[in-house]
Amino acid sequence: MECSRTAVALKRQRFYGLITMLFVLTSSSGAKAADNIIMGMAGLNFSFLPFQIAMEKRFYEKYDLSVKPVLMRAQAAIPALVSGDVDYDTHFGSLVRGAVSGLPLRVIFSTAEKQMFSLVVQPEIKSAENLKGKIIAISSFGGTQHLVTAGTLRAVGIDPDREVKMINVGNEAVRVEQLRSKQIHAAMINPPMSVMMKKEGFGLLLHAADYLDLPLTGLGATTKKLKENPEQAKRVVRALNESLQFIRANRKETIAIFARWLKIDTEIAADTYDVAVKVLSADGTATDKAIVASIEEAKDTGKIKGNFTPRDVSDFSLVRAILTESKQKK
């Protein structure tokens, strides 16, 4: 009798175990696993807010994406992108320079139509003429920040090679510290730090957006990624496009997220938003004129020869497809 009861109990255990296993298998097959993506990030400022908004508002999750942002310098990010260690990258200028240098890269999304840099100067510098003979800090020679600084100076009649002394000091935090300690006279700084520096008494002498039609931030991928997994790339672009629209339509919440993200005062975040939102891309694309300007900027390094078209460095077909689909739904 006891053996019979034991046998029945074992059968029940096997039955319920089988049911449990079938339930787990059914649930697993029904749930779509999110794509794990590594994204190279160029910085932490307003121009990268669309990427942070996509995280906080779960736009990535909405499209089955698990994105890990990694802060990287362009010198490391571009090789990592080409090798496949990084899936997507945000160094717009470096992506363009890489493409015209022969690397298999394309810009597929633009978050900012123009540069947000302001030339932050010591209080005694009141005009472009006052910059002559002064020390201007840059992040690295040949990088976007260097080329933007040089282009802006040329636009106001200053020869960046002869009339000022440019020194390579590193990232924005270092440039800010050297401004505060008076080791340098000027440096291009992005918001919100440029806004904070103004409140500290520094001058904002020149704004790059007033002189240069250069896109600031965007997203790029390898041609291999776009060929082998266009569906994933489209989901990434779709999430970022929703993020752009959210930022424009939700000022108060965007400011709150921005302030929390960078741990800055809400007033600073609001001032930054009101200035910087004006140069955000309207729909994730960049004009041919802007892309050509980026190509010319790349050629200014003197290392790149030849003629290139916007199609050689960018591919906004995914964005345009999404925009067309959105119009058809309305």
Name each region found by the language model.
Residues 2-18:
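Bacterial N-terminal signal peptides that target proteins for export
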Residues 228-305:
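Secondary-structure end/capping motifs
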Residues 35-171, 175-181, 185-191, 202-213:
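Short, glycine-/small- and polar/acidic-enriched structural segments
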Residues 144-162, 239-271, 310-312, 322-323, ...:
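Ligand-binding clefts/hinges and TM-proximal coupling segments of bilobed small-molecule sensing domains
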Residues 93-94, 166, 173-262:
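Pocket-lining segment of extracytoplasmic ligand-binding domains
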Residues 296-330:
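Conserved C-terminal helix/tail region of periplasmic/extracytoplasmic solute-binding proteins
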Residues 16-27:
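Bacterial N-terminal signal peptides
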